[in-house]
């Protein structure tokens, strides 16, 4: 029970990143740079307190992983700009779970028993149904929907999902480091990635500075993710953390004024239920 409580913290902190950053404002590149600065400050503080042993391998893979992460985060910020937070974030979380699970099954053979394939396939089906309903648009809301560019949003989500899943595979399946050890090299890679996406034209303005708060949310989520994994297992902790999409949906509607018709609200609730059940089933399969 304690582990599940810890897992709820990254659910809220990571789920809040999208609407908090969009409430602050700025371009996706400014949002990413500000977030990575905050993450770097948080990581430096953790390093000064913990003083973990640092190896060359840890630095190299940590920086590489952070750079790959920045691809995922920049794409997600672009997707939120094109589609809205309440649509983009659940699609992003769900697509990460689906693609990550498929890679785990096909490449790393994480499912070995028949029951795992049955329950896992049901979980993936529920996530796909959740995709459909969370992004489904009502024709009656066309005046609002025309302000969004869903084709660009889906393209941004595609490379965002690839970046996030590559990052997850690197640290969960290929190289396994302690989070408290790798968090600083990873933050350095995140900053380098953000600077690259700005074409090395760094401009520290109010949006970059304010978005550093979002980096603190990321860091707090990482610490509690570590605690949750130690108490309840990584599979359960990760699956629960991905339910932050629910926080994104609610935050986008309440704090960013993203409008939904009654029909769209019913679809959103259906999508949320599918996400919750699908994510929990995936956690059960992996554990």
From Swiss-Prot:
Principal subcellular localisation of the protein: membrane
Keywords: Cell membrane, Membrane, Sugar transport, Transmembrane, Transmembrane helix, Transport
One Pfam family per UniProt: Sugar_transport
InterPro entries: Sugar_transport
Bilayer topology annotation: Multi-pass membrane protein
One MF term in the entry's GO annotations: carbohydrate transmembrane transporter activity
GO CC terms, sorted: plasma membrane
UniProt-recorded name of the protein: Putative sugar uptake protein SPy_2205/M5005_Spy1856
The species this protein was found in: Streptococcus pyogenes serotype M1
Classification lineage: Bacteria, Bacillati, Bacillota, Bacilli, Lactobacillales
């Amino acid at each position: 029970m304690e582990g599940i409580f810890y897992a709820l913290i990254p659910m809220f902190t990571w789920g809040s990143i999208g609407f908090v950053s969009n409430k602050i404002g700025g371009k996706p590149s400014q949002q990413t740079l500000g977030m990575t600065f905050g993450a770097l400050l948080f990581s430096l503080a953790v390093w000064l307190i913990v003083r973990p042993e640092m190896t060359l391998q840890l630095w190299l893979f940590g920086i590489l992983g952070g750079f790959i992460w920045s691809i995922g985060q920049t794409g997600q910020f672009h997707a939120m700009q094109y589609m809205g937070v309440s649509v983009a974030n659940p699609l992003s979380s769900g697509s990460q779970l689906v693609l990550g699970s498929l890679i785990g099954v096909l490449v790393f053979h994480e499912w070995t028993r028949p029951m795992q394939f049955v329950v896992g396939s049901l979980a993936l089906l529920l996530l796909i149904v959740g995709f459909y309903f969370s992004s489904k648009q009502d024709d009656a809301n066309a005046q609002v929907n025309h302000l969004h560019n869903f084709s660009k949003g889906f393209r941004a989500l595609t490379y965002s999902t690839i970046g996030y899943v590559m990052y997850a595979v690197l640290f969960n399946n290929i190289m396994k480091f302690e989070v408290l050890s790798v968090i600083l090299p990873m933050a350095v890679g995140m900053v380098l990635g953000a600077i690259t996406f700005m074409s090395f034209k760094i401009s520290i303005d109010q949006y970059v500075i304010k978005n550093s708060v979002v980096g603190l949310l990321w860091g707090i989520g990482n610490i509690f993710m570590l605690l949750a994994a130690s108490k309840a297992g990584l599979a359960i902790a990760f699956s629960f953390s991905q339910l932050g999409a629910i926080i994104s949906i609610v935050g986008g509607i309440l704090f960013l004024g993203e409008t939904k018709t009654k029909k769209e609200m019913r679809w959103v609730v259906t999508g949320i239920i599918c996400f919750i059940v699908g994510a929990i089933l995936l956690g059960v399969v992996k554990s």
